[in-house]
Design a protein with these regions (language model features):
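Mid-domain, small-residue-enriched loop/turn segments at the edges of structured enzyme/sensor domains
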Residues: 21, 114-170
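A short glycine/serine-rich beta->alpha loop
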Residues: 36-43, 89, 100, 147-148
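Short, glycine/proline-biased beta-turn/loop segments that scaffold the active-site neighborhood
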Residues: 62-88
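Conserved catalytic neighborhood of penicillin-recognizing serine enzymes
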Residues: 78-113, 151
Length: 229
């Protein structure tokens, strides 16, 4: 690839060489963006969980939800796939914040359904719209019979969510900081970091702080792969 090409042209060349459908939105937080198909709608897979987390913090900021309230794993929350709550069994009780944290860091599907049930699907969508993500919708709770219709979003909306978290402007500075800390613990970050030199991310041998840290939320289903951070 020509090293004299602009970043946008280099990214476009990679995207256009791909046989499937791919779009990207990049924001350096200093006024420069790369936008290629940024307003195309895509199935969210588990990336919708980032919006659910934001909706939870918005409701908590208004006193309409409590991060410390206990919620219970009910039979209707069960769904297969990623997560740890399957090992605990129906009847397990945990704080809303703990369920939301599991929803992000290990993409726990049961925890996600618990949070959706706690907030309400319509409330979540109202919060998503209010936060300015006009092309993002949570269509259903997680159920593999409906997984292809879980939610839709755009690269622009998803990048905007993380840009606001990074700037401390999503809900509030305190809420953004808490969400950022949760996103930093996300286990499934290999898509974003795939081509990063490992020594940038892992400095355990030297004892030095990592040169790069990642706060993200990925999602995948069938032939769909999404990531953002």
């Amino acid at each position: 690839m020509d090293k004299n090409m602009t970043l946008e042209k280099r990214i476009a060349a990679e995207l256009y060489s791909y046989q499937g459908k791919m779009s990207v939105f990049v924001d350096d937080l200093h006024g420069h963006t790369v936008e290629i198909g940024a307003d195309e709608e895509f199935e969210t897979a588990s990336t919708i969980k980032a919006y659910i987390l934001a909706a939870l913090y918005l409701q908590a900021s208004r006193g309409k939800a409590s991060l410390e309230e206990k919620i219970t794993y009910k039979p209707e929350h069960f769904v297969d796939g990623s997560g740890m709550l399957r090992a605990l069994g129906v009847g397990a009780s945990l704080k809303v914040k703990d369920a939301a944290t599991m929803m992000i860091i290990c993409s726990d599907n049961i925890a996600t359904n618990m949070v959706i049930d706690y907030l309400g699907l319509d409330v979540i969508n109202a919060c998503i719209r209010e936060m300015g993500f006009a092309h993002t919708v949570l269509h259903n709770p997680l159920h593999f019979d409906l997984y292809a219709d879980l939610g839709t979003t755009t690269p622009r909306d998803y990048a905007s969510l993380f840009a606001q978290v990074a700037k401390g402007t999503l809900v509030s500075a305190e809420a953004s900081a808490e969400m950022l800390a949760i996103f930093r613990q996300q286990h499934y970050n290999t898509m974003l970091t795939r081509d990063f030199p490992q020594f940038y991310l892992d400095c355990e041998e030297t004892g030095e702080p990592e040169l790069i840290w990642v706060a993200s939320k990925s999602g995948s289903m069938n032939a769909c792969r999404n990531d953002g951070g």
